[in-house]
Curated annotation (Swiss-Prot):
This is ABC multidrug transporter atrB. ATP binds at G830, S831, S832, G833, A834, G835, K836, T837. The keyword Lipid metabolism does not apply. Belongs to the ABC transporter superfamily. ABCG family. PDR (TC 3.A.1.205) subfamily. It is found in: Cell membrane. The chain crosses the membrane at residues 489-509, 520-540, 569-589, 601-621, 628-648, 710-730, 1161-1181, 1205-1225, 1239-1259, 1267-1287, 1300-1320, 1395-1415. Residues 27-43 have a biased composition (Polar residues). Residues 14-44, 743-782 are annotated as: Disordered. It comes from Emericella nidulans (strain FGSC A4 / ATCC 38163 / CBS 112.46 / NRRL 194 / M139). Glycans are attached at N43, N79, N275, N390, N484, N672, N790, N1024, N1338. It catalyses: cycloheximide(in) + ATP + H2O = cycloheximide(out) + ADP + phosphate + H(+); chloramphenicol(in) + ATP + H2O = chloramphenicol(out) + ADP + phosphate + H(+). Disruption phenotype: Leads to increased sensitivity to different classes of agricultural fungicides: cyprodinil (anilinopyrimidine), ketoconazole, prochloraz and propiconazole (azoles), carbendazim (a benzimidazole), fenpiclonil and fludioxonil (phenylpyrroles), fluazinam (a phenylpyridianine), azoxystrobin, kresoxim-methyl and trifloxystrobin (strobirulins), 4-nitroquinoline oxide (a mutagenic agent), camptothecin (a plant alkaloid) and the phytoalexin resveratrol (a stilbene).
């Protein structure tokens, strides 16, 4: 069979002008001239029917007339093999097993074997050709597309040759914007609108040289943007946010289309599309394929596509097909020959089947059908299929194409391509640059987008600024009107420190934002939109006005309320220093986020970093008192330079009088300044009752001469971290596609290995769909006998559902009716937005908002109390506890949802029945995990169904889109399971997204909805859809002979074939509608006259609350036990903070200065809370989302059990954290080591672990999402820290706050108990510099001169030399209790009093978790007659 390789699909259909030398399959050289390039009309395309085809041709002709060279490449690859580290099953360590060092060391020596994910692939896609790559998940389709898109990072080994035109893969790297891949994920900034997203993409791809007749770059961009939006039918979404799971925006299908047109905006020459029709209905998917076909034909693109569930209409638009199985290429050749080739091997393509599904199903025993006479000789697995293909004539024909890159034609096309790209690029760019617009324009466009992102998420921005203003007012009132004497020194220093601290804490959000935007940036980098440096500079440019505003609204209230120096120069110096420090700290955290691969690592480091920088600012530990082993931190700390400059700016040139306990002696009779001196104030000079600001600064090793030096150093640090950010951002890489790997919990490893060993022994040479069965597995009939039979009839009538929107009430369901009987498999279908999921949610009582009218009945009676747990509901999203194994998830559901009268053993036995039914034996002991690290999409779907089945649903089972995102075989498997359930008497109602004809035929009845939830058909489907076909044919829309009836119906009702006809009215006027309503009334009355099929036990939950709590708590404890990342991060935070704190405050003595150091050492313990809460909250909210999404709605267990489980699961680790912090911190600080004191401190630390956990959990319990929680944390923790009596002592707190918030603050009692136990009994020994030294008057002795003072104001002072007549030395305090008295801690019993109050606060914080969770739990809506 000789096939000419330059035909109507081999070369572009326009501008064929050069001579070309190519071999045909007989290896003879054929020279083709311009006119003989094709035997067909080059202007004819299989996509000529596409509405925008004329526009594509017009654009192409305009470019040709403008003298533009064509950008045609083609892709050829040979002997392409890819290896990855084999990760078929990774072991998930638990908290204890991770410390089994000998075992881990033994296992680490066994290097994981390499797995070939793509094996010796070959092919050629010339300009103007489309290749369809088919294969089941894990067969290597995505890997092949990544290789052809020249994205090789993350793979262990890549061998073989890939050529782009005549270029090698290395040469093609500089043209990465012309060889692009659209991945399966939709990665966007959700707060941008569709229009803004497309503005950004199109602006960065406007060519330098414009076609004739185009007025400006903006006109070109606007025209292209309009064309792209029209091409996918989403022009109406231009002002709608893209959105995501948290931010409401366009629908899932529309978001996928935005992803498609953003990729098309690159104007590339080679496109790789990875499952780009996922989430689109068949009509839209076909339109997309036609669009790609049209552009490929006219523009000479090379298009490679991989699809799941491709209909025949889509399949027929391709030129070539490549089929992969286990990485092996079992077919590559013309699309028209693929089906005949497979049929010649003995496989049968069922009538009405999708050919694409047939091609991928030939190696799956449960899917394939063998032609009579071929049973003994058909190829049974991938190796046998490959062997057959290697011998075939198809391969022999295709080999001739592999010379294409060396042909004269390819070389000329490649030269034209290079010239065209050079003309498109801005002249300022270097020749090797992959970008289109120059660097300055990239920055401008990125700055515009940054502001759009901010404006799009106004709520977060406003919350941030309002909380800044609130915090500024609180801080200003806390440090209000600080006096200009020694009493105000500490208060003013605190206010200046807080000015830097708060803005630095806000800057920590940069770490989170870095990871939120990273996937989008990596995608845009692969599209060659902009250089990462442009993105980083744009972020900074966008920061400046925002931070100016933020710093201003913080600085103004704080500065003037505190009463800092009323001098314009001093104020503006303060403002610019706070701004410069904030910019530097923003750069620090942005660099920290950019430098790490995972958020866990970045958050761990940033949390530790902020602690270190705060501690070494110079506020807690003064510069002269820092230990030499950590003093280097001071020199690299931007906060330290800022704090030095702020204090120098404020106190320079001032005279600071000493007052109160800082002045010795003081009071009546001691007015002579020459016999007074200052104590407890740095820089004091004997015999002087004041301190100069510059002496005070010198005592801290500060100087006013450093102010502008430090300002310069701050900007130097800023510049350094910006450079680090740019370098780190430039090195960001996308994750490699290694395929999902199973996770085996350590405690199940042996069982899994034994299971795998049995599998290997029983394995035959034929690949099976199931690797093994559970012990004592029963055959199909035994399983069927054990399944629960349903005898109840479920009906709904005149169902309407209305929701309130800003524009008024909106009706989503309009008088819908229907029924599901036992043994019936019902399909619920309709186009996107028709209300399929809404109807299921209403029927299953899952709605908590809106108004529902109509009747929903079981056996003609109102829904029983137990309905939500008696009916199974498999939602579209597979929501599961990731750290549970499959068996545990099923057992959890069975134990909680089967009736309380059923023995436990019987419930667990039924789990085995369902595991056998759903063929889950080989994954029963693996963790569910998350998508990509755990079960595959199809396996997760089966687990979702299993979780509902084990509950023995006695009424019916709802399933929402169970086949969405699955390949054809997995979808067929899923529906086959559902058919099996219906056959044994279950009632099943399923929403399904465009099934193949084969799947459609499995259903018994159909409810078809149009936009607005209007019914257009309800009734039997008939044999192979005959009844439905007959209905539509009778009303003027006959189904073509080979068309899929399911696709045809959607097209007729709401797609290209609707022709504006109102099918809802057609239905209402039909006899089928009248008969269905009569039948419904008959079913209801008949069912109501009989005893109910389901007996209501009257319980909302199947199990009593106590048993619910035990089962839920056990699961939650096991999940935390296995979540080593979370536990290790918590422990590392405590150990790291404790060691750092302990060594920073090493062996403190008993001087007055060291008393203050002890205060700060204990105060620092409070700061483990922000880091620990930041780790705890996402986990709490993730579990709450699982509970809200599925477990609450199915009445599995009460919210009380949920909260109890979460609280109890944390307790063992909180005890461990307290032990580790205490041991690593306490004994190196010089605090009392006696068991009564140390034991009391440990007990208080243990209570604090519970206190901050309770605070973190009650914020999480009510927060709508994790972002809100992270914005709330600083306000709550910041307020508690501010008013606990440390930053401002009790006596100096303003009266407004002092009499309520101080006493309601748990941190006040925490610090009170810790200080009392550690300082109360200490004898104070002043250092030489701390004494007040002066000469008594008239030669009197010190004791005689000071006797009145020591009995009055100086009662706590300690006179060292009472008999001396000169140089009297007075220490400010005698014992620790004297110092604590100034902090409102008046007796030792205050320690235990405060401990008891902290314990009450712990209980109160946990009570708040229950209370706020109860407040958040809404009741489901019921239908109103």
């Amino acid at each position: 069979m000789s096939t000419l390789t330059v035909g109507d699909t081999a070369l572009p259909r326009e501008s064929r002008e050069t001579m070309v030398s190519i071999r045909d399959s007989d290896s003879t050289t054929t020279v083709l001239g311009e006119d003989s390039a094709s035997t067909t009309d080059p202007n004819v395309s299989r996509a000529d029917g596409w509405a925008l085809m004329p526009q594509v041709k017009e654009q192409n002709e305009r470019e040709a007339e403008s003298g533009f060279k064509r950008r045609e490449l083609g892709v050829t690859w040979q002997n392409l093999s890819v290896e990855v580290v084999s990760a078929d099953a990774a072991v998930q360590e638990n908290f204890l097993s991770q410390f089994n060092v000998p075992k881990l060391a033994r296992e680490s020596r066994n290097k994981p074997p390499l797995r070939t994910i793509l094996d010796n692939s070959h092919g050629c896609v010339k300009p103007g050709e489309m290749l369809l790559v088919l294969g089941r998940p894990g067969s290597g389709c995505t890997t092949l597309l990544k290789m052809l898109a020249n994205q090789r990072l993350g793979y262990k080994a890549v061998q073989g040759d890939v050529r782009y035109g005549s270029m090698t893969a290395k040469e093609a790297e500089q043209y990465r914007g012309q060889i692009v891949m659209n991945t399966e994920e939709e990665l966007f900034f959700p707060s941008l609108t569709v229009g803004e997203t497309m503005d950004f993409a199109t602006r960065l791809k406007v060519p330098f040289r414009l076609p004739n007749g185009v007025e400006s770059p903006e006109a070109y961009r606007e025209e292209y943007k309009k064309f792209l939006l029209q091409s996918m039918g989403i022009s109406h979404t231009v002002d709608t946010k893209v959105g995501n799971e948290f931010i409401r925006g366009v629908s899932g299908g529309e978001r996928k289309r935005v992803s498609i047109i953003e990729c098309l905006a690159t104007r590339a020459s080679v496109f790789c599309w990875d499952n780009s029709t996922r989430g689109l209905d068949a009509s839209t998917a076909l339109e997309w394929t036609k669009a790609i076909r049209a552009m490929t034909d006219v523009l000479g693109l090379s298009t490679i596509v991989t699809l799941y569930q491709a209909g025949n209409g889509i399949y027929d638009l391709f030129d070539k097909v490549l089929v992969l199985d286990e990485g092996k290429q079992i077919y590559y050749g013309p699309m028209t020959q693929a089906r005949p080739y497979m049929e010649a091997l003995g496989f049968v393509c069922r009538e009405g089947s999708n050919v694409a599904d047939f091609l991928t199903g030939v190696t799956v025993p449960t899917e394939r059908k063998i032609r009579s006479g071929f049973e003994a000789r058909f190829p049974r697995n991938a190796d046998a299929m490959l062997e057959e293909y290697n011998k075939s004539a198809v391969k022999a024909d295709m080999i001739s194409e592999y010379d294409y890159p060396d042909s004269e034609y390819a070389k000329l096309r490649t030269e034209d391509f290079k010239q065209a790209i050079a003309e498109e690029k801005a002249k300022q760019l270097p020749k090797s640059s992959p970008f289109t617009v120059d660097f300055m324009n990239q920055v401008k466009i990125c700055v515009t987008r940054q502001y759009q992102i901010l404006w799009g998420d106004k709520a977060t921005f406003i919350i941030k600024q309002v909380s800044t203003l609130i915090q500024a007012l609180i801080a200003g009132s806390l440090f209000y009107d600080a006096p200009n004497n020694s009493g105000g020194l500490f208060v003013k220093s605190g206010a200046l420190f807080f000015s830097l601290l708060y803005n630095s804490l806000l800057a920590m959000a940069e770490v989170t934002e870095s990871f939120q935007g990273r996937p989008v940036l990596i995608k845009h980098k692969s599209f060659a939109f902009f250089h990462p440096a442009a993105f980083c500079i744009a972020q900074i440019a966008a920061d400046i006005p925002v931070l100016i505003f933020q710093v201003t609204i913080f600085a103004l209230p704080v500065y003037f309320m505190v009463g800092l120096e009323m001098d314009a120069g001093v104020f503006f110096t303060y403002w610019i220093l706070v701004f410069a420090t904030t910019m530097a700290m923003t750069a620090v955290f942005r660099a920290c986020g950019a430098a790490f691969k995972t958020f866990d690592d970045a958050s761990k480091v940033s949390g530790f970093l902020i602690s270190a920088l705060i501690m070494y600012t110079g506020y807690m530990i003064r510069k002269p008192e820092m230990h030499p082993w950590f003093v280097w931190i001071y020199w690299i700390d931007p906060l330290a330079y800022g704090f030095d400059a702020l204090l120098s700016n404020e106190f320079h040139g001032k005279i600071i009088p000493c007052v109160g306990t800082n002045l010795v002696p003081a009071g009546p009779g001691y007015e002579n300044a020459t016999t007074q001196s200052c104590t407890g104030v740095g820089g004091s000079i004997p015999g002087r009752n004041y301190v100069t600001g510059d002496d005070y600064l010198a005592s801290l090793s500060y100087s006013h001469g450093h102010v502008w030096r430090n300002f310069g150093i701050l900007w130097a640090w800023w510049a350094l971290f910006v450079v680090v950010t740019i370098i780190a951002t430039s090195r960001w890489k996308g994750a490699s596609e290694n395929g999902p790997s199973l996770l085996i919990p350590r405690e199940s490893v042996e069982k899994h290995r034994q299971h795998g060993h049995r599998d290997e022994e029983s394995q035959s040479n034929e690949k099976t769909s199931t690797k093994g069965k559970s012990e004592g597995v029963q055959d199909s009939s035994d399983i069927d006998n054990q399944l629960v039979r349903n005898t109840s009839v479920f009906t709904w009538k005149d169902l309407c559902y209305t929701v309130k929107t800003p524009s008024g009430d909106r009706q989503l369901l309009d008088h819908v009716y229907g029924w599901v009987k036992p043994g019936m498999l019902g399909a619920l279908m309709g186009s996107s937005g028709a209300g399929k999921t809404t109807l299921l949610d209403v029927l299953a009582q899952r709605k908590t908002a809106g108004t529902i009218q109509g009747s929903v009945l079981v056996d003609g009676r109102p829904l029983p109390v137990s309905f939500q747990r008696s009916a199974g509901y498999c939602e579209q999203l597979d929501v599961h506890e990731p750290y549970a194994t499959v068996r545990e998830a099923l057992e959890f559901s069975a134990l909680l949802r089967q009736p309380r009268t059923t023995p436990r053993e019987e419930k667990l036995k039924y789990v085995d029945v369902i595991i056998d039914l759903l063929e889950l034996h080989d994954i029963a002991d693996t963790l569910i995990g998350r998508v990509g690290a755990g079960l595959s999409v199809e396996q997760r779907k089966r687990v979702t169904i299993g979780v509902e089945l084990v509950s023995k649903p006695s009424i019916l089972i709802f399933l929402d889109e169970p086949t969405s995102g699955l390949d054809g075989q997995s979808a067929y498997n899923t529906v086959r399971f559902l058919r099996k359930l219906a056959d044994v008497g279950q009632a099943v109602l399923v929403t399904i997204h465009q099934p193949s004809a084969q799947l459609f035929a499995e259903f018994d009845s159909l409810l078809l909805l149009a936009k607005g939830g209007k019914m257009v058909y309800f009734g039997d489907i008939g044999d192979n859809g005959s009844t439905v076909k007959e209905y539509f044919a009778r009303h003027g829309a006959p189904c073509p002979p080979n068309a899929n009836p399911a696709e045809h119906m959607i097209d007729v009702v709401s797609g290209s074939l609707s022709q504006g006809r109102d099918w809802h009215e057609v239905w209402k006027a039909s006899p089928e509608h009248t008969n269905a309503q009569k039948e419904l009334d008959r079913i209801i009355s008949e069912a109501a006259s009989k005893p109910p099929g389901t007996v209501d036990d009257g319980h909302e939950f199947a199990m009593p609350l106590w048993q619910q709590t035990v089962i839920v708590t056990k699961r939650t404890c096991l999940a935390v036990y296995r979540n080593t990342d979370y536990v290790n991060n918590k422990l590392a935070l405590h150990i790291g903070s404790a060691l750092f704190n302990g060594f920073s405050f090493w062996k403190m003595g008993a001087s007055v200065g060291e008393l203050q150091l002890k205060l700060f050492a204990l105060f620092n313990f409070i700061f483990v809370a922000p880091g620990a809460i930041a780790q705890l909250q996402p986990l709490f909210i993730e579990r709450r989302d699982i509970y809200d999404a599925r477990e609450k709605k199915s009445r599995m267990y009460s919210w009380v059990a949920f909260v109890t489980g979460l609280i109890v699961s944390e307790l063992p680790y909180l005890v461990l954290c307290a032990v580790l912090y205490f041991v690593c911190f306490y004994y190196q600080t010089g605090l009392p080591t006696s068991s009564d004191k140390a034991g009391a401190v440990f007990f208080v630390m243990l209570l604090y672990e519970g206190l901050y956990t309770g605070i973190g959990q009650f914020i999480s319990a009510y927060a709508p999402n994790a972002v809100f929680a992270t914005l709330t944390n600083p306000l709550v923790i910041g307020t508690l820290v501010s008013f606990c009596g440390v930053l401002v002592p009790y006596g100096q707190i303003q009266e407004f706050w002092r009499y309520w918030i101080y006493w309601l603050n748990p941190f006040n009692y925490l610090m009170g108990s810790l200080l009392t136990f550690t300082i109360f009994d200490v004898d104070i020994k002043c250092r030489e510099s701390e004494f007040a030294t002066f000469d008594p008057p008239n030669g009197s002795s010190c004791i005689d001169y000071l006797s009145t003072y020591l009995q009055g104001l100086g009662v706590s002072a300690n006179l060292i030399n009472p008999d001396a007549t000169s140089q009297c030395q007075v220490c400010q305090y005698t014992r620790g209790s004297d110092y604590l008295y100034s902090l409102n801690l008046k007796d030792y019993y205050y320690g235990w009093r405060d401990t008891a109050i902290v314990a009450l606060f712990v209980l109160s914080s946990y009570a708040l978790v229950y209370g706020l969770m109860k407040l958040r739990t809404k009741a489901s809506k019921k239908a109103e007659e």
